[in-house]
Amino acid sequence: LVGRTRQDPCMDLLRTPEDRFLGLPDWPYPPSYVTVDGVRIAYYDTGNPEASAVLLLHGEPTWSYLYRRVIPPLITAGHRVIAIDLVGFGRSDKPTSRGDYTYQRHVEWLQSVVVDHLDLTDITMFCHDWGGLLGLRLVANYPERFARVIAANTFLPTGDRSPGGDFLSWREFSQTAPDLQIGNIVNSASLTDLPPEIIAAYDAPFPDERFKAGARQFPVLVPITPDDPASRPNTEAWTSLARYDKPFLTVFSDSDPVTAGQDELLRKLIPGSADQPHRTVRGGHFLQEDAGPDIASILIDFIPSA
């Protein structure tokens, strides 16, 4: 599909053919869709529809498939599980121009799904990577909707401190690699050696380079200087997060150089993190691949029994 949106009449969109998603291992969940200003956003709503939602947010350059080993135990435990494919990823539409991807626009897209369309409350959020850069903005904007939060290998940068050499190296690679091989990137940043069919599932949303504008753009949207457009709104978000006193847990991995130490910063600044059983699990950046069942257990233990 190539279309134009009401939000921006010059926004060209691609939609990954559905047959790219057929027969993926361990992914039986049918998608639901909401269209926001002409952009179709996919999400997966499974489990007990009467229960409060566990919201799972992926990051760069993955899609909700990242949670395939986390979702089944949550369903068995009686929870409702909602995973959202960010715009540019998974089954969601993919603007072809990198300029159409902005930090603020991603926040608004996510807000449209979580708040305006699904109207979720009493949310338990698990956010990873860019899922945190966006999800924590929603927590700041709507703290009353979020009952508890788990942040995993993520942060909310304001551009006033260096992100570190490992992130800058990744940022440079993402801009200069002639072929951004998504599945191999996930494999290389996991301790687990992923089999070919799992690598292929991460490649599925991206038939060719035209579909990868979002994956290319996300790294340069991370604010690394104080004059970045996202610096001020993220700083304002921290004012709200500094008052968030509901349970806030960090679950980071022991082998992710990109986000190492960010868990300490989150725990220092967010009051809800006090006296929580923070965890460090064995894993690379994509800890869902290395410790998926452990993450599910942590989530189940974190949510009070009804």
Question: Which residues does each PLM region occupy?
Answer:
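Catalytic histidine-centered segment of alpha/beta-hydrolase-like enzymes
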Residues: G283-A296
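Short amphipathic alpha-helix adjacent to the substrate-entry channel of hydrolases
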Residues: Y65-I82
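Active-site glycine-rich loops that stabilize anionic/oxyanionic intermediates
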Residues: G59-T62, D129
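Flexible "cap/lid" subdomain of the alpha/beta-hydrolase fold that forms the substrate-access gate
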Residues: M11-P30, I41, T46-G47, A53, ...
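A short acidic, amphipathic alpha-helical/loop segment
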Residues: R69-V70, L265, D294
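Structural cue for short, hydrophobic secondary-structure segments
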Residues: L56-G59, A83
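Short, Lys/Arg-enriched N-terminal segments with co-localized hydrophobic residues
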Residues: L1-C10
